[in-house]
């Protein structure tokens, strides 16, 4: 037989599993399979009697395409739920969307035109908003499905779903009845750009340039008498919001600070002693003399003149006055600041807020300034105060200032009548902090973060002055302005909304909504009634999902097991969900909270379109496939901010290729293996096979532990090392000769195939939650009789096998691996240069010399094994070494020589040996000749 004919006697690899992944084209096929074959539903059915694990989906906003942060979030959730399903948990996934709110309403107004929108009714706007939201839900849904996320995509939850809205109204009613909801005139964040109140979670901070002014306010006689001084005296204040001075009704001091009366060229000025030097330097006052000193509390209840209005201001005391900056005398306008409002309550100060919804000053600000936008009012007030001698210094400063997160424009504090959930006073804060202690936070610092936010958060403003949202279900007696709330009436509203949706609130009159029977029962018949026109904050919408979803969708329950979102949700969805839950039922809606960081570019910079450093999921999928994106999600330590760039994605692609090649090699060499008939018992395996199974067993336990702890980045490192190093670079390389050249059904060959089968089945399950498409492709490439289920996602998790754990093999095989590395380095050199000795390793004879007797004995005892491991034709240990030996790099006292092997090359296995021992096969080595008998 010729060399070519002998090739046909080898058991060469056969598989349809391609080396080139071609994921962008293949992946849609598997999405189609999972959808048509209802794999998600079958997974639930398979585990119907198992313990439930509920991960509740935080709803993304239905506006615009998904971004890389969405992809990270959805894939992390999918990894967890697929793993839990493998482990026998019944793990439903109901995806959701946040569908009300200002961004959608603004987009609709923009599309129809501001002028036309103003002519439209609230109902018309609402219908357009619903259509717009549903359009983006459809688009985003397809984008999420393309990521390989399994879930109940045909029945997602939308916050505009009538069932959800009805539950939200019920929740509002419970919190109202519990005494935590009230209506009050309070300063709130207000966006003039979008003409509505904002919650804290809707505020972002950016650098902003503001005027910084020192203003002197003239003291009245009672203050002069208090300090025993009969010349003109001024209290010096500092502010960066001159437009709020029309609302000034007090100056706040710290009762424990030392204040001084200073004689200066700018008049006799009162300010805190600790701040006097810095303030005078800032103003440019070089000569000053301390005339008198006193405590802040000594001036309480004295008065001063407003600088441009006929108003007397009061000197008051407050703990919020610090010595960090300014003068220690704080301009106080309860209508324009939270601290001012709180201290104003104690002194029964009027809440004046002379600014309208567009940011224009009203008549209350005085004739000089009414009608001016607040930014223009700043200039006009500064000009007037300069002319009247009240301003001592004006300059511009850049500082961090609150902005509307949607319009990116500065916000103001404005006192308006709003609906609030009460945090100041009452027991909600204390109750919530106690509940937080019982929640498991991952990472653990999340507990302190949400706790510290809860300790300091003000009353939550839950009303918005827009049309697209869930109505606040309150009626009024229009003549007395008295609130009308009865649980029976609310129950009827909930029933109507559940049947018709929240548009019914806009469509029907108060009388129609309440109904004849309840009008009579509560003595409302004949009264002129009106409905509340404000809607609820969208954070109340999403914060109601523990009721609107977990109590409504079949198979879900509260508290759920896990909320998983970005770390910004400590002040967002985690926060609002917790507050609404504690305020209604006194408990948490979730047992555990897992947070991930933000996605930055490759250099750690925040992504922005203007910088051109954004990475879109769609672009990654088009070029590399969703599995590469999934692998990135599974490889990063998501607990901190993570990075992505084209280079990082390429690195992921390389790591993926190594895992894929390992799978392909095993599939190619398992084509004739049936585990039911060909499996070899552990006791009959070679030692190297047992070493491989020990490595696999250690990895199995490590991977399971990492999945249980949600530490996917740890398991990825382990899987990648096992596949690329332990398997491809070592074990699979060494057993190639056995697989190709031994008899088809020999114990040696079948043992290697048994190990490979175990490795592949286990490895496929390990990677399936992350590399979902590739795992399914591997599963499909297995012979049908070896697959335990129609889809990898209907299989059971692997079972640990204590028999495979052989830690005693580790030390020996670590030494063997070290020797192989040293020999491989020398073999590589022998292949190179003009005087190359060998073409491949089977051409080689390796000679080893060592003065280390322990090492020498080790090599002698394992000589035949090492020859197989080194993949060489001959190996010897010598007692002396000449100049042709070179030192090993990392093993002391070891010298190595590479020579060409003696004998002739076997035409079948390519090893050098004594040929011609078999007349029928004169060009084969004795082993190959025997195999062919």
UniProtKB/Swiss-Prot annotation:
Motif 'KMSKS' region: chain residues: 606-610
Compartment(s): Cytoplasm
GO cellular component: cytosol
Keyword Cytoplasm: yes
EC numbers: 6.1.1.5
Broad class of where this protein is predominantly found: cytoplasm
Residues where L-isoleucyl-5'-AMP binds: 565
Biological role: Catalyzes the attachment of isoleucine to tRNA(Ile). As IleRS can inadvertently accommodate and process structurally similar amino acids such as valine, to avoid such errors it has two additional distinct tRNA(Ile)-dependent editing activities. One activity is designated as 'pretransfer' editing and involves the hydrolysis of activated Val-AMP. The other activity is designated 'posttransfer' editing and involves deacylation of mischarged Val-tRNA(Ile).
The protein's name: Isoleucine--tRNA ligase
Annotated organism of origin: Fusobacterium nucleatum subsp. nucleatum (strain ATCC 25586 / DSM 15643 / BCRC 10681 / CIP 101130 / JCM 8532 / KCTC 2640 / LMG 13131 / VPI 4355)
């Amino acid at each position: 037989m010729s060399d070519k004919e002998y090739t046909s006697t080898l058991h060469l690899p056969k598989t349809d599993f391609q080396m080139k992944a071609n994921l962008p084209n293949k992946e849609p096929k598997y999405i189609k399979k999972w959808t048509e074959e209802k794999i998600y539903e079958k997974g639930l059915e398979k585990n119907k009697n198992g313990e439930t694990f509920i991960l509740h989906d935080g709803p993304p906003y239905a506006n615009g395409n998904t971004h890389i942060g969405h992809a990270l979030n959805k894939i992390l959730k999918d990894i967890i739920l697929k793993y839990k399903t493998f482990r026998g948990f019944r793990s439903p996934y109901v995806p959701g969307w946040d569908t009300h709110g200002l961004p959608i309403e603004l987009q609709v107004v923009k599309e129809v035109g501001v002028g036309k929108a103003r002519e439209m009714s609230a109902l018309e706007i609402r219908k357009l908003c619903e259509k717009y939201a549903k359009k983006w839900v459809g688009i985003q849904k397809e984008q999420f499905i393309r990521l390989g996320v399994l879930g109940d995509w045909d029945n997602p939850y939308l916050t505009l779903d009538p069932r959800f809205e009805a539950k939200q109204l019920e929740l509002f009613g419970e919190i109202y009845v519990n005494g935590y909801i009230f209506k009050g005139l309070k300063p709130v964040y207000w966006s003039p750009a979008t003409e509505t109140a904002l919650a804290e979670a809707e505020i972002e901070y950016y650098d902003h340039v503001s005027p910084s002014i020192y203003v002197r306010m003239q003291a009245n006689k009672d203050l002069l008498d208090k300090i025993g001084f009969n010349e003109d005296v001024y209290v010096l204040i500092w502010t960066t919001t001159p437009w709020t001075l029309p609302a000034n009704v007090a100056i706040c001091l710290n009762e424990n600070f030392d204040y001084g009366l200073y004689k200066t060229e700018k008049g006799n000025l009162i300010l805190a002693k600790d701040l006097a030097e810095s303030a005078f330097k800032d103003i440019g006052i070089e000569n000053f003399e301390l005339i008198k000193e006193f405590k802040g509390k000594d001036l309480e209840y004295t008065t001063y003149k407003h600088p441009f209005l006929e108003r007397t201001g009061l000197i008051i005391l407050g703990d919020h006055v610090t010595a960090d900056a300014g003068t220690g005398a704080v301009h106080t306008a309860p209508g324009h600041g939270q601290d001012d409002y709180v201290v104003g309550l104690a002194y029964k100060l009027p809440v004046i807020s002379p600014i309208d919804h567009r940011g224009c000053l009203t008549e209350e600000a005085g004739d000089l300034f009414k009608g001016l936008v607040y930014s223009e009012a700043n200039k006009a007030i500064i000009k007037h105060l300069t002319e009247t001698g009240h301003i001592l210094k004006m300059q511009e400063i850049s500082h961090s200032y609150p902005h509307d997160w949607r319009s990116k424009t500065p916000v103001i504090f404005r006192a308006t009548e709003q609906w609030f959930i009460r945090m100041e006073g009452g027991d909600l804060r204390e109750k919530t902090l106690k509940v937080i202690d019982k929640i498991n936070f991952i990472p653990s610092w999340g507990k302190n973060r949400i706790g510290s936010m809860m300790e300091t958060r003000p009353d939550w403003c839950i009303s918005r002055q827009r049309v697209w949202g869930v109505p606040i279900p309150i009626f009024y007696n229009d003549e007395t302005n008295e609130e009308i709330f009865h649980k029976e009436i609310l129950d009827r509203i909930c029933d109507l909304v559940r049947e018709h949706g929240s548009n019914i609130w806009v469509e029907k009159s108060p009388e129609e909504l309440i109904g004849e029977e309840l009008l009579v029962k509560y003595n409302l018949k004949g009264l002129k009634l009106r409905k509340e026109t404000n809607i609820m904050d969208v954070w109340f919408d999403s914060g109601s999902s523990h009721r609107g979803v977990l109590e409504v969708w079949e198979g879900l329950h509260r508290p759920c097991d896990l909320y998983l979102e970005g770390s910004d949700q400590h002040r967002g969805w985690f926060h609002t969900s917790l507050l609404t839950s504690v305020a209604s039922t006194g408990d948490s809606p979730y047992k555990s909270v897992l947070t991930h960081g933000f996605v930055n570019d490759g250099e750690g910079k925040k992504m922005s379109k203007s910088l051109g450093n954004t990475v879109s999921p769609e672009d990654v999928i088009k070029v590399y496939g969703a599995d590469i994106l999934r692998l990135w999600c599974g490889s990063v330590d998501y607990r901190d901010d993570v990075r992505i760039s084209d280079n990082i994605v390429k690195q992921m692609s390389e790591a993926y290729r190594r895992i894929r090649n390992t799978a392909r090699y095993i599939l190619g060499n398992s084509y004739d293996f049936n585990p039911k008939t060909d499996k070899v018992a552990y006791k009959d395996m070679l030692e190297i096979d047992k070493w491989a199974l020990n490595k696999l067993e250690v990895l199995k336990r490590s991977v399971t532990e990492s999945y249980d702890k949600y530490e996917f980045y740890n398991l990825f490192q382990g899987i990648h090392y096992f596949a690329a190093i332990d398997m491809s670079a070592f074990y699979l390389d060494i057993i190639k000769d056995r697989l190709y050249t031994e008899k088809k059904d020999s114990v040696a060959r079948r043992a290697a195939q048994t190990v490979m089968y175990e490795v592949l089945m286990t490895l496929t399950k390990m990677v399936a939650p992350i590399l979902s498409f590739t795992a399914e492709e591997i599963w499909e490439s297995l012979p049908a009789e070896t697959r335990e289920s129609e889809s990898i996602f209907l299989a059971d998790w692997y079972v640990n096998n204590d028999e495979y754990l052989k830690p005693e093999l580790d030390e020996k095989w670590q030494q063997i691996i070290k020797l192989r590395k040293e020999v491989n380095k020398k073999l590589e050199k022998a292949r190179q240069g003009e005087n190359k000795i060998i073409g491949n390793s089977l051409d080689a004879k390796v000679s080893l010399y060592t003065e280390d007797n322990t090492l020498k004995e080790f090599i002698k005892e394992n000589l035949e094994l090492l020859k197989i491991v080194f993949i060489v034709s001959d190996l010897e240990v010598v007692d002396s070494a000449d100049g042709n030996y070179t030192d090993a790099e990392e093993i002391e006292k070891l010298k190595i020589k590479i020579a060409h092997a003696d004998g002739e090359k076997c035409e079948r296995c390519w090893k050098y040996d004594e040929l011609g021992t078999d007349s029928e096969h004169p060009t084969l080595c004795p082993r190959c000749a025997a195999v062919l008998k």
